[in-house]
């Protein structure tokens, strides 16, 4: 028999009554009723109510023990009276009469209670993360994470993928974020980098003749924290396949994602075959390449309306003439909304840094007209054209934004979310997945005016190689794709460029000399020169998948030991100083900014 327990704290049922049992766990809660002391004993699996009578010689000792101390109890299972049954507990029909107990681990005074649902400052929670992880909600999140990863591994194996581990110490490469650098003791003055992603290695695996690869890969990026992004490190389901096109990758990932979300969530899937939305369409209709398709509001372009002579809204007309764009959002049947509804949205837009949102409501008495601060500037014919473009009807309202394309996309995207939430249009019980496809290969840096890769430099451009318009690189589309759920990007992926000559050409457009490419990507370029198959892949974020399944808004709620927003581990006191001897051994000296 196990020394510490005969059962876990979730196992005992009405069928266990009369049994002598041994339980071990943490004291979750104590309730002293004078002659009776109630102990809620908790372990990883659940909770059992234990009781001790004042006549028991151990009563006074047990009464003094601090919450969250670990104890072992010996006792007998008894049936609860009908009125004391707790239907919220798996063990709620029984309790254990304590005969004796043993303290296995004492607990100091708690900096935060474990049994409480009260929210505490992040600093306290992260410093005492081992206590925070005992709280039921986050404890369940971490268990969910483990189960999701285990299920993913099983599904990937069924799909014919093999799991391989790629190096953690590798070379630095410009993949978008700053690298974490590791000095080499044996090669003074040189550095390893922790991988931002196993990008080059997984392609090399394909070149090595393996057909389908995956791993639950740790990735390291020296970037700022966000609610949906941990600083420092994160994990992704990294996968790559040989002899595939874009749709082949989509079919595998869709099957996996649908199975995962059906197994671990009761929420509905809006689509089991995810819509494919071209990047340009996504930026127009949703103002973002991370659209939330639960939101029915659609953005339309009305720039040409402000060229018309029968539209006299001069502020917008002048801006459009100088190159600005006008985008609008239609809200259905909002004619009876109070003026405060519209003014509050306009005020909110100004708080976001925009100049506001113009608006009017379409009405019809004898003729079509527009009610609102700017309605008088539009003729009947102009309103009819707006209705034709946007699908607006009598009784609908229209919000307008005007400005530079990037600014107007940003504010209309935010406004789309804001208005939908105010009107309660979003079904929170739904997952809406989609693919955003046809990303541009290149973009122009507005500050330097130089051509840069817009996403992954290793992507294959679309079209026959002989027909690619290298003279107009901003027109080149790539086989790059993102998978998005409820406005959250889960992953980027691509069909890879496996042709060295083409890779040199594309890097030259982005300003790289051949020598620079050879220096940065020598292993990759060399391998591709020895017979590389067409291949592609993707890497959905494990943290974000679990965040969605757990219905959490912050990724730190599904990460076991996260850092804070300053990339500090408050529990382990990292990063920390190192001694002079360590630095000397590495050939390093510190030169700190004053």
Swiss-Prot record:
Pfam families: GAD, tRNA-synt_2, tRNA_anti-codon. L-aspartate binds at residues 175, 221, 455, 496. GO terms for molecular function: aspartate-tRNA ligase activity; aspartate-tRNA(Asn) ligase activity; ATP binding; nucleic acid binding. CDD domains: AspRS_core, EcAspRS_like_N. It is found in: Cytoplasm. It comes from the Bacteria. It is an enzyme of class 6 (ligase). The record marks 33 as: Important for tRNA non-discrimination. Residues 199-202 are annotated as: Aspartate. Its EC number is 6.1.1.23. It catalyses: tRNA(Asx) + L-aspartate + ATP = L-aspartyl-tRNA(Asx) + AMP + diphosphate. One of its GO terms (biological process) is aspartyl-tRNA aminoacylation. ATP binds at residues 221-223, 489, 541-544. Keywords: Aminoacyl-tRNA synthetase, ATP-binding, Cytoplasm, Ligase, Nucleotide-binding, Protein biosynthesis. One of its GO terms (cellular component) is cytoplasm. InterPro entries: Aa-tRNA-synt_II, aa-tRNA-synth_II, aa-tRNA-synth_II/BPL/LPL, Asp-tRNA-ligase_1, Asp-tRNA-ligase_1_N, Asp/Asn-tRNA-synth_IIb, AspRS_core, GAD-like_sf. Homodimer. Belongs to the class-II aminoacyl-tRNA synthetase family. Type 1 subfamily. Aspartyl-tRNA synthetase with relaxed tRNA specificity since it is able to aspartylate not only its cognate tRNA(Asp) but also tRNA(Asn). Reaction proceeds in two steps: L-aspartate is first activated by ATP to form Asp-AMP and then transferred to the acceptor end of tRNA(Asp/Asn). This is Aspartate--tRNA(Asp/Asn) ligase. The lineage of its organism: Bacteria, Pseudomonadati, Pseudomonadota, Alphaproteobacteria, Candidatus Pelagibacterales. The gene is aspS.
